[in-house]
Design a protein with these regions (language model features):
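Coupling/switch/interface segments within P-loop NTPase motor domains and analogous charged loops
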Residues: 26-33, 46-136, 273, 285
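Long C-terminal extensions of eukaryotic subunits of large macromolecular complexes
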Residues: 137-140, 151-152
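Membrane-lumen/periplasm interface segments of specific transmembrane helices
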Residues: 42-45, 49, 231
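Conserved helicase motor core of SF1/SF2 NTP-dependent helicases
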Residues: 2-21, 38-40, 123-130, 148-155, ...
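Distinct, well-ordered alpha-helical segments
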Residues: 142-145
Length: 410
């Protein structure tokens, strides 16, 4: 899903004797490994050669924003519900499809009027050569299912493995499914859904009810890390209770560091990094510092350089390469799918999670996604996990983790 994983897979491919996993010269040719964006875009380009899909955002006339029944909230309704779930006009206006997980909005009962303005947005987008990717997927699926378009055979595959499928919208998965002749294999962890509430598979036209296998061996983490992670996962509402992964490696206990302020937390992180490198003989590239609010580690990065002469960079920086001998920095979203021998997790501010664009969901859904982010971060660690928090935190997702760690260390 994330370009970071593409870089990571490119880095590890030679170790697995995989040559040229990405064919940048011939984007329509078959690839062994690729991102969902790459895969979907080649389908969209073939269907709409004059359209440039744009996944970063979109523009529209201001009067639509002002005059429709939802005001600015129409973008959230469109971007977080209608487009990603492939909701049709009939479902929205006549069948009154439930907006599960979405925050209640004013005038939401005026569905026909809302849809009319959404159609206006579609009309405006269709006039542009740069169009929002999710919308281009949406209208291509309509053409395919109405018999107006067939995906070329050269863009189809017999089998397709989609990793971290919970991060993809139902619309994206529905389009990808249309390219598969035989079987689509999905790997997913509902408790690691950090970009959207977990996908509703039937919206993607996929039935997993009779073909579901729980993987119950954790090859990544130590017993100690796995035990903390599983106890925390149990605090997530609706967590999969049948999936109880087992581990087989011993390691040091997970450590909790509570501090009064950020300066004290950074000082302890510097001390921990120094210990890992000078005393335990780890290398800088073995260490990843994960933060809950993206962009807060610039000061720490300077301290690492000034006090320990260690360079660091965010894993999603365009210039970063996994072969770089530097400390890794990451947010709770862009660490997905990665693993590191040592993780220092800086949980400083619960309110920072709002920056991930989850304000459109109701409080129960936001709580689940916040906990998913924490669970994802702590499960990136292979051997050592240190958690740094502020002592006066009042946020339930953070305090629940602190309570677990305090019990573990008694």
């Amino acid at each position: 899903f994330k370009p970071t994983l593409k870089k990571y897979n490119k880095y590890i491919a030679p170790f697995l004797n995989i040559k040229n996993p990405f064919d940048e010269e011939n984007p329509l040719e078959e690839k062994i490994i690729g991102t969902s964006k790459d895969y979907v875009n080649k389908i969209l380009r073939a269907a709409f050669p004059d359209i440039i899909p744009d996944s970063t955002g979109y523009s529209i006339r201001e009067e639509i924003d002002k005059e429709n029944p939802l005001g600015p909230n129409i973008w959230r309704e469109l971007d977080s519900f209608i487009l990603p779930n492939f909701v049709t006009e009939k479902e929205y206006c006549e069948e009154k499809i439930s907006r599960v997980g979405m925050k209640k909005i004013k005038n939401s009962d005026e569905r026909k009027s809302i849809w009319d303005y959404i159609e206006n947005i579609f009309t405006e987008w269709d006039k542009e050569n740069i169009q929002y990717t999710e919308y281009v997927c949406y209208k291509l699926i309509q053409k395919i299912e109405n018999g107006e378009y067939k995906i070329p055979e050269k863009l189809k595959t017999d089998y397709l493995l989609v990793d971290d499928a919970q991060d993809l919208s139902a619309t994206t998965l529905r389009l990808m499914r249309a390219t598969v002749r035989k079987s689509m294999i999905l790997t997913y962890d509902k408790e690691q859904a950090v970009f959207q509430p977990s996908c509703i598979w039937n919206r993607a036209g996929i039935d997993i009810s009779r073909n579901l296998i729980n993987l119950n061996i954790n090859f990544r983490s130590t017993n100690q890390i796995n035990e903390v992670a599983e106890k925390y996962r149990a605090t997530i509402k609706g967590a999969n209770k049948e999936n109880l992964p087992k581990t087989f490696r011993l390691g040091p206990p997970v450590e909790l560091h509570e501090n009064k302020n950020q300066d004290d937390s950074f000082a302890q992180m510097i001390s921990t990094v120094r210990m890992c490198i000078n005393s335990l003989n780890y290398k800088p590239e073995d260490i990843c510092i994960i933060e809950s609010s993206y962009g807060d580690l610039s000061e720490l990065s300077e301290k690492l350089k000034n006090e320990l002469d260690l360079d660091s960079a965010y894993v999603d920086d365009s210039e970063f390469d996994f072969s770089d001998i530097i400390i890794r920095l990451a947010g709770t979203q862009n660490c997905k799918g990665l693993d590191f021998p040592i993780v220092l997790f800086y949980l400083n501010d619960f309110t920072s999670f709002s920056q991930f664009g989850i304000k459109q969901f109701d409080n129960a859904t936001i709580d689940i996604m916040n906990r998913n982010m924490i669970y994802t971060a702590i499960t990136r660690s292979i051997e050592m996990l240190h958690v740094f928090t502020l002592s006066d935190s009042t946020a339930a997702p953070i305090n629940d983790l602190k309570a677990i760690l305090k019990t573990e260390t008694k």
